[in-house]
């Protein structure tokens, strides 16, 4: 029959094909549709439905570290919350009852500063109670804004009942936590040097301190030896000339508080003599630093008079360079080094942690002549009423005037700054309340828990928090602020002892706070609580460090809420929290219960640009979160987070987001194909037993099961980038690059209810059930969009489901997995040859090709098993297998050569295969024999593909 006759007699066979059909849209339009879905979810109380589905199941508790209730959320917040949501959803899939209770940190300075901008400072334009009321209102507004943004990301949680550190009940329980720590004797008052911000007017926690470069005046100052005979006896040389032990410091303003000069017991020192304008002068300097110091003093030719170690000079008396009525001792300290400066350290216990620590050993006076605003107090020995930074040049000038300034150089160095004001802080001794690290073994207990009880992801987190706790000072928990949880202590005016009824008083105050909030403490007098004892006791008016608020949520939240429990399975935050929330939580839990509050810590990196720079508006690389969601939708953002290896810094750029968008489309298109080809399939009546499936369908279920095991393990180990990799690889290689292309012919052209089609649909049904679950913790919106489109789906939400039990054939398959891998390799080799033939204009599509294979014996064994069905695997119209010979073109497979030519015959109007028997049946013009059987007969039978 001629081509003209074929065209004239053509019949439209489209109606005889099983074409795919689904309501699952090709275009996601996530940025618009996600908002609608969210509204439906929360109207339907989705979170409560998830909880109801897990009643009686073993709990998994991820405890939410509270973000601060101030400002809009950014990409870093999104990374944190999405990671938490992925974990909660994957643990729910694993059958756990995994509640998620979000929280907010509500007290503290940042909110005070915002409120001050609106209503003024306390005591100037507004009273404290009114100020606290405004702080509470401001925090609530910020929480509402952040809650909306977090929900938009698809984070499922108890958003209507979050924990807030300013809730009356939680404020009361923070009180109670403090009481338990005090009862266990971990709290002590003290006049100790603390990080102090002059702008905040308050002490700062370690976590509130950042290091930035600062320009300072570095000076070398001489402390004169008072008794040269004493010195002579110590160093075994007759000393006649003026002798200075020289200190080097970058904080001249601390010199009025100096109480000693520290040397190291084992460092070698030298007594050297030089000639100055005033005559002969002796210096005591660390041996390794003599040359650099003498050069700094612009002097020459030092003569060494004696060598000795620092221990020889212990308790030698020195003259303070500025205060004629003060003499100070030489002391020994382990903190002294000989790598810079002079090897001698100016020691002011009121202005430094090391100074304070070594001062305790020598019973040195803790003197603090500086007020909270950085101004010398009226009682200061010199420069009273001057700001310390204005006094600095005057101190330097005074030292020069008395001949004690040996060098003055400006330097740039790393110096602690206030995290809020970005201004340099000072170390200042003030009466504060501390959690002692060593009084009751808190440090050792915490280190033991780190070593034995806590899992770290990644494992370097262990060394980081361990080193921080090993070296940290006592925790100053008191603050001089208005908006914070008070410290409900009564201190005896004479003895400084706490009231003997402190535990009972804390509970009494806590009960009042449950009803009235923290104003219940601030608005009452001491005698309202302790009656006539008020004449002998002062009520503490300090507030708690906000890190204590959040650090005690293991007690105030996990132990108080029925759906939660302590210790938590996991705390998850950014890497900065090793010195913040992770540490404050560990210390308070050890102080209360002598156990860690978490079983595992997960740390994620920060978001940076493609060059590793921090995202910031000032650098011009900041990407607003709403812009990302507009481009990718929340699901695209979630895929970006999950695809990143959070153990390192997480790069963000438009190019990266574009790649994520491509990955999302690939997954979505695969999912759409799966759903579309389940058209007309009812699992209850149409599904086949897995042992009755065609070999290819059994193989793909086996592969799906292997992928599922990889994915489940990756979720359990919190390797979400591995989940994404396995998911996309399955889409690209197993499904898109192999299985789905092969089954199209069977799906579309065999009889609708044939074993051949139902076998493929059965496999597709099982795969889509598993596939949607795999993606649901990450691509939550898309998974739920697809979920109700799975035939005969019973559960309303994928989020109440558990991992799918993928069926795998128990009997020996016709082809082994190794055989299928061989076929995949052959298919790849054939495709390359067809592509070459297409480029040479020998063939058009794959179905217009005839493929001849020359295969060695082992390959033939596999290929010949499939007989005529081999063409369906290779997606060609005709395949011929020959014994191996040097024919055709060589391939990358050993023992395989291929030749591609145009297939013989005509193109079937229905299946598009080119076959000799097309148009050989007058009643069915344009059809091949196989299609005639599928249209009018019992349908073809498949065994392999």
Give the role of each language-model region.
Residues 197, 418, 492, 528-531, ...:
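Short cysteine-rich clusters marking metal-coordination/redox-active sites
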Residues 105, 194, 198, 204-212, ...:
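Acidic, turn-prone loop/beta-hairpin segments
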Residues 122, 212, 347-350, 389, ...:
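Conserved phosphate-binding loops in nucleotide/dinucleotide-binding enzymes
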Residues 417-421, 606-693, 791-794, 840-843:
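Catalytic adenosine-cofactor/nucleotide-binding cores of aminoacyl-tRNA synthetases and other
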Residues 2-280, 348-361, 365-383, 404-443, ...:
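N-terminal, positively charged nucleic-acid-binding surface of large information/translation enzymes
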Residues 150, 173, 475, 662-675, ...:
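Core structural elements
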Residues 227, 362-374, 481-483, 491, ...:
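Alpha-helical recognition segments enriched in aromatics with Gly/Pro capping
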Residues 29-39, 156, 168-373, 447-478, ...:
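NTP-handling and nucleic-acid-processing catalytic cores
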